[in-house]
């Protein structure tokens, strides 16, 4: 059964790689490295599909898994024939592309069915919630700071900053496709203003959630929860960060970037923290818009407008957020229950949450492929998304096998690695190649 799991997982990701390489082939035209890789991958996917279908009928106990893999194996040569017809006629390849996306989606759904119903758990004893002490915002470097300074730095949630800054930087790099030029002042001011805004939003979150934080092991040592920093001082600190952020962005960047940054702060500090997080299981999904906005902010800082590639990059992050955060929610579900937060694993259970992780990961990969098509990215972006995406997907597959909360935490880190690598690939495609 483990062999079948690995085979279907590999086939699913190979199909995704085939799709993004197909997009790159369409963009480059002719006999390019992307085209050669696409044709080689197409043959490999066909062999994997045949093997997966044969193994499904031999080993799988669930009829819909058998028929799902079989349907993909039947649909694949049909969409390949469409691709050959497009190649011969020189016509548009949208139907071929949609066929490939359909096969990928079918395989992902089939993999989810298989994992949910047929994979035997190996570590049920490890299914108790994984509780680490502390908030997760601290580090060895942070603890070297004087106590007073360290507490205020903790308020800003510094571990959120690197990925959000990388996202904004990728948005700025994407904007160069419009012909806009990057300059050092714009880059530095956008990132500095963004860091201050992230710090302000994090501080407001600490202030509002202080009572619930005291109930949770993970957050009980936060500065406001422990009264190490008073509510009034923390609020004033957050307001000060926001004011300086707005001044920097308006003065050194442009009003649109400043306005979008203000929207992001309100989205996180009010819409997510106050309205969504304590009231609905959809808090993570809808709240993902706050983390997606830096992509648009970065583009606006350079181009002075909002463009489709920036919106697609934001959509990648929006879809990635549930696939990312649900892993943490699984690992700390007992803690969230103590804090009276209706996180999905608390309300719907771990199995349902893992299914959602797979579906949102699939959506992330597809939107990332659409971004590559619109922005005209090549094999570097395609291979990065597929290879690191495979690593992310495999950690989720392992969760189904072990039901270990430590593996959920590993998936959380793998999701960070996926987005970070994807953003670096965007920088390489736009600034180097």
Swiss-Prot record:
Per the record, membrane topology reads: Multi-pass membrane protein
Organism's domain of life?
Archaea
Name where it mostly resides: membrane
The reaction(s) annotated as catalysed by this protein in its Swiss-Prot or TrEMBL entry are: heme b + (2E,6E)-farnesyl diphosphate + H2O = Fe(II)-heme o + diphosphate
> Which residues lie within the region annotated Protoheme IX prenyltransferase?
165-430
- Keyword Cell division in annotation: no
* Chain segments carrying region Unknown: 1-164
Give the UniProt keywords, A-Z: Cell membrane, Heme biosynthesis, Membrane, Transferase, Transmembrane, Transmembrane helix
- Return any one Pfam family short name: UbiA
Which chain regions cross the lipid bilayer? 4-24, 35-55, 67-87, 95-115, 160-180, 184-204, 236-256, 257-277, 282-304, 308-330, 357-377, 378-398, 413-433
Q: Please give the coiled-coil regions recorded for this protein.
A: none
Localization annotation: Cell membrane
Biological process annotations from GO: heme O biosynthetic process
Its EC number(s): 2.5.1.141
Signal sequence range:
none
What function does the entry list? Converts heme B (protoheme IX) to heme O by substitution of the vinyl group on carbon 2 of heme B porphyrin ring with a hydroxyethyl farnesyl side group.
* Similarity comment: In the C-terminal section; belongs to the UbiA prenyltransferase family. Protoheme IX farnesyltransferase subfamily.
Q: What is this protein called?
A: Protoheme IX farnesyltransferase 2
Q: Which gene encodes it?
A: ctaB2
């Amino acid at each position: 059964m483990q062999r079948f799991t690995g085979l279907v997982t590999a086939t699913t990701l190979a199909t995704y790689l085939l799709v993004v390489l197909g997009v790159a082939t369409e963009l480059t035209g002719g006999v390019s490295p992307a085209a050669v890789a696409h044709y080689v991958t197409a043959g490999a996917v066909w062999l994997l599909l045949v093997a997966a279908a044969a193994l499904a009928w031999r080993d799988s106990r669930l009829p819909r898994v058998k028929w799902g893999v079989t349907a993909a194996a039947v649909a694949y040569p049909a969409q390949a024939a469409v691709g050959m017809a497009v190649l011969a006629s020189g016509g548009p390849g949208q139907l071929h592309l949609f066929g490939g996306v359909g096969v990928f989606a079918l395989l992902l759904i089939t993999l989810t069915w298989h994992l949910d119903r047929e994979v035997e758990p190996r570590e049920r004893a490890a299914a108790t919630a994984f509780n680490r002490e502390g908030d997760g915002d601290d580090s060895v470097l942070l603890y070297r700071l004087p106590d007073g300074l360290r507490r205020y730095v903790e308020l800003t949630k510094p571990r959120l900053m690197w990925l959000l800054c990388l996202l904004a930087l990728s948005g700025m790099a994407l904007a160069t496709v419009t012909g806009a030029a990057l300059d050092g002042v714009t880059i530095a001011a956008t990132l500095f203003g963004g860091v201050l805004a992230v710090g302000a939003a994090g501080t407001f979150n600490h202030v509002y959630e202080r009572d619930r934080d005291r109930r949770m092991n993970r957050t009980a040592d936060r500065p406001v929860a422990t009264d190490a920093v008073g509510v009034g001082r923390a609020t004033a600190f957050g307001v000060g960060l926001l004011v300086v952020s707005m001044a920097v962005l308006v003065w050194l960047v442009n009003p649109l970037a400043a306005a979008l940054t203000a929207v992001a702060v309100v989205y996180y500090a009010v819409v997510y923290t106050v309205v969504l997080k304590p009231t609905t299981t959809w808090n993570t999904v809808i709240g993902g818009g706050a983390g997606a906005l830096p992509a648009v902010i970065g583009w606006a800082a350079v181009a002075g407008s909002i463009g489709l590639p920036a919106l697609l990059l934001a959509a990648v992050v929006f879809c990635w957020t549930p696939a990312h955060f649900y892993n943490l929610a699984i690992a700390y579900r007992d803690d969230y229950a103590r804090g009276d937060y209706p996180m999905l694993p608390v309300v719907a259970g771990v199995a349902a949450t893992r299914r959602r992780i797979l579906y949102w990961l699939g959506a992330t990969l597809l939107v990332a492929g659409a971004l590559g098509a619109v922005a005209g990215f090549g094999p570097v972006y395609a291979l990065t998304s597929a290879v690191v995406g495979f690593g992310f997907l495999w950690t989720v597959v392992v969760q189904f096998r072990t039901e270990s909360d430590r593996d959920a935490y590993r998936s959380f880190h793998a999701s960070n690695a996926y987005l970070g690598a994807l953003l670096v690939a965007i920088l390489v495609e736009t600034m180097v190649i």
